[in-house]
From Swiss-Prot:
Protein name in the entry: Calcium/calmodulin-dependent protein kinase type II subunit beta
Phosphoserine modified-residue sites: S367, S394, S397
Region: Disordered, residue numbers: 349-407
Regulation of its function: Activated by Ca(2+)/calmodulin. Binding of calmodulin results in conformational change that relieves intrasteric autoinhibition and allows autophosphorylation of Thr-287 which turns the kinase in a constitutively active form and confers to the kinase a Ca(2+)-independent activity.
Modified residues (Phosphotyrosine): Y17
Region (Calmodulin-binding): 291-301
Catalytic activity: L-seryl-[protein] + ATP = O-phospho-L-seryl-[protein] + ADP + H(+); L-threonyl-[protein] + ATP = O-phospho-L-threonyl-[protein] + ADP + H(+)
Amino acid sequence: MATTVTCTRFTDEYQLYEDIGKGAFSVVRRCVKLCTGHEYAAKIINTKKLSARDHQKLEREARICRLLKHSNIVRLHDSISEEGFHYLVFDLVTGGELFEDIVAREYYSEADASHCIQQILEAVLHCHQMGVVHRDLKPENLLLASKCKGAAVKLADFGLAIEVQGDQQAWFGFAGTPGYLSPEVLRKEAYGKPVDIWACGVILYILLVGYPPFWDEDQHKLYQQIKAGAYDFPSPEWDTVTPEAKNLINQMLTINPAKRIMAHEALKHPWVCQRSTVASMMHRQETVECLKKFNARRKLKGAILTTMLATRNFSVGRQTTAPATMSTAASGATMGLVEQAKSLLNKKADGVKPQTNSTKNSAAATSPKGTLPPAALEPQTTVIHNPVDGIKESSDSTHTTIEDEDTKARKQEIIKITEQLIEAVNNGDFEAYAKICDPGLTSFEPEALGNLVEGMDFHRFYFENLLAKNSKPIHTTILNPHVHVIGEDAACIAYIRLTQYIDGQGRPRTSQSEETRVWHRRDGKWQNVHFHCSGAPVAPLQ
């Protein structure tokens, strides 16, 4: 009887130590190679939990990382498969994030920013020369090799990276992080290497003043700003930045990717290659202070999002301004975090770009000064809307959180479309409701007295005879939404729905139902194909 030989090369050659990162399918631990005593970071992926597509994604990331050998890129030293686990052995990067290091410095100038962007561009140039587009350049992926002064900047996390042939432009899927996405990606046009240069432009802008060039509470408005290239250089902070620095930013943030500066050209820009005579040496204390708040927002946002999602609440056009009812504990936790966010974010000095009327492009989406920027309440994590790209998983060796971003993005879509459906119900808008529902929608609901209802006619009756005639305010809160993603084009959501309304006698009432909805995506659009609602037959719940 033949015996199966199991590979134990990692176990034989490396000694594992403490955890330094953790995620959905993997953990990162410090390790030492026994024969040399050298330290590394081992990303350990539990392959028993991966789908075939996830395996392809892992192979692509390892293949790309093996290609890249540069002093400004976190290097992959080994890739080993053992039974049930895959080990990626990276540089052990101990200096933390570049942006966190900058705010701890006693002195920081335009010349320092020039040196930082030069190293980032050197890494990007190497990627592009090797036919690799990173697609997720952002502060979280810019690390320092060590805590030593003058340590090298290291580009990390190639979980979204793609391979391209030469200057090939194609649609590789909607991937990246909202504030750093290029106009061509947002327009869903063919793209390639220039997307990395656009992100470098955003990073350089932040390096110089401590806040981003594009921001809005509303992600749609944020995307409109980016597509229009609507940024500016407001006073007084930009008055002390040299014209050469602004010129480089303008060339990086050029809307047309064909006209955007390339990595090798940017490295030859006078502000980069002649920094000692061109870049200002003046200490930029205001930038450091703004950057502290920018960093704080990045760290805080995840906690806010997690807490707020637990009691996700929204209101429709005819609602009252009274807050939705929620559990005291959850409400307290959420409000505590929101107050923390406000204290960090509501002032220009806190790193929020002041909104001015003089924008580079008149199509800029305007926001009132003092409102929360998207980093506070909008997710600034990586998003993927194209299943071809597989699951985004941050390289744990970069000290970032690993998440199944593809699944996460789809779950957010399902919660959002469920909100839209309930909003249509509360508005009595049958047309909007019918667009979201499958024509053959099936349901078990109290109004049907336990019978299975199929089609839209049953629901149309309530819209035409009750909901459309209801002029009283309605306020709905979704509590504890749980989404199960079922393959690429199906999902199920379960939640508790609280509805506040005014009864016929003018008294405030609250009703509760437990609901489950099944969603199916057809032609790129999610449609509700079935729902099950508990409770007594009380309008206006359905």
